[in-house]
Amino acid sequence: MTRHAEKRVVITGIGVRAPGGAGTAAFWDLLTAGRTATRTISLFDAAPYRSRIAGEIDFDPIGEGLSPRQASTYDRATQLAVVCAREALKDSGLDPAAVNPERIGVSIGTAVGCTTGLDREYARVSEGGSRWLVDHTLAVEQLFDYFVPTSICREVAWEAGAEGPVTVVSTGCTSGLDAVGYGTELIRDGRADVVVCGATDAPISPITVACFDAIKATSANNDDPAHASRPFDRNRDGFVLGEGSAVFVLEELSAARRRGAHAYAEVRGFATRSNAFHMTGLKPDGREMAEAITAALDQARRTGDDLHYINAHGSGTRQNDRHETAAFKRSLGQRAYDVPVSSIKSMIGHSLGAIGSLELAACALAIEHGVIPPTANYEEPDPECDLDYVPNVAREQRVDTVLSVGSGFGGFQSAAVLARPKETRS
């Protein structure tokens, strides 16, 4: 892993769409205020479902600058990704036309792809699922795009003029972390000079809500949606579904400095592991997540003593929060009790594949502004979750090095380390 030390990769552009407001500034304002943006589902009639709450985005495709064609034919997840890619490129100050297009890469994560569009079209052509599709002429042209998640990274690649490596990463709820990890590797390995990377998911649709209902993973606290997402709280009863996108522009630090670009954070380390255990179950000792944390810190040439903040997966399920707490203790030892830990899912919900990138955006902004977002709705401690979860109120302090972790159904465990880019030690 030390082979990468000579190439330092930094984030020079950020684009965010999340519940609670459009843009990076609105996202950060919501997090630091400790406000929640979860509410009763309005995107469809969720009355028949067990969980009827979500973190929705007030999103107007035309108002966001998409063309009528993009607004009418792109899946919502694709729309979010394209808008965020545009915002990230603008924020970076980079003109893609000034870069060899073969040296621009794209890495976009998604857990459920274009499920919303697919769900909608299936209902339309099958009379709500009451009959099989017998007349293919009823299907819209973009049905194939809804069927394959590669359509998302294709549109982002076209937006960036990217002719280099382009990929979609789909590793469940770690997709957003993994996509950025892969994008970082493209630059470190010399396969790209610029990578537009991140993740998107718009899973608030009947089929996705039904899937999580079936395994009782989501909160049923429908009478109080603003307080339903309660990571690490003793009374948590599952996660609250969300939607969103975060996209970054990555460059080598020296190239960013040559053009006078602002660097939010350096991607120092990344690692991923699998528990090879169960579709939804987690081993209680947190070993695989702990191994990912240790490997990411090793690649970053950091230790637990260097950490100022941990952005937890913190989904709000009974087993995840216990498992994650155990992983922090296993990997960091006594230091785990001293490092502030928080979960932004308490405020914006769990946007599946997109959440890892949204959390990395929060980490980069924590470094930028010297503020740690809180864990909202934290009221009653769980004896098995006994760390400092930054309850309810943001905390101002210098933040130089941050760990962000993710856990996904299927056993995926990922970790990334971001650091203040002006640091010179390798």
From Swiss-Prot:
Impact upon substituting S351A: Produces high amounts of tetracenomycin F2
UniProt entry keywords in alphabetical sequence: Acyltransferase, Antibiotic biosynthesis, Transferase
Gene3D superfamilies documented for this protein: 3.40.47.10
Transmembrane segments: none
InterPro entries xref list: Beta-ketoacyl_synthase (IPR000794), Ketoacyl_synth_AS (IPR018201), Ketoacyl_synth_C (IPR014031), Ketoacyl_synth_N (IPR014030), PKS_Beta-ketoAc_synthase_dom (IPR020841), Thiolase-like (IPR016039)
Reactions listed under catalytic activity: 10 malonyl-CoA + 8 H(+) = tetracenomycin F2 + 10 CO2 + 10 CoA + 2 H2O
Alphabetized SMART domains for the sequence: PKS_KS (SM00825)
Keyword Acyltransferase included in the entry's annotation: yes
Pathway given in the UniProt record: Antibiotic biosynthesis; tetracenomycin C biosynthesis
UniProt GO molecular function: 3-oxoacyl-[acyl-carrier-protein] synthase activity
EC number(s) recorded for this UniProt protein: 2.3.1.235
Active site: C173 (for beta-ketoacyl synthase activity), H313 (for beta-ketoacyl synthase activity), H350 (for beta-ketoacyl synthase activity)
Family under the similarity heading: Belongs to the thiolase-like superfamily. Beta-ketoacyl-ACP synthases family.
Function of the molecule: Involved in the biosynthesis of tetracenomycin C (TCM C). Part of a type II polyketide synthase (PKS) that catalyzes the synthesis of tetracenomycin F2 (TCM F2), a precursor of TCM C, from malonyl-CoA. TcmK and TcmL form a heterodimeric alpha-beta complex that catalyzes the condensation reactions between the growing acyl-enzyme chain and the malonyl-CoA extender units.
Protein name: Tetracenomycin polyketide synthase ketoacyl synthase alpha subunit
Organism: Streptomyces glaucescens
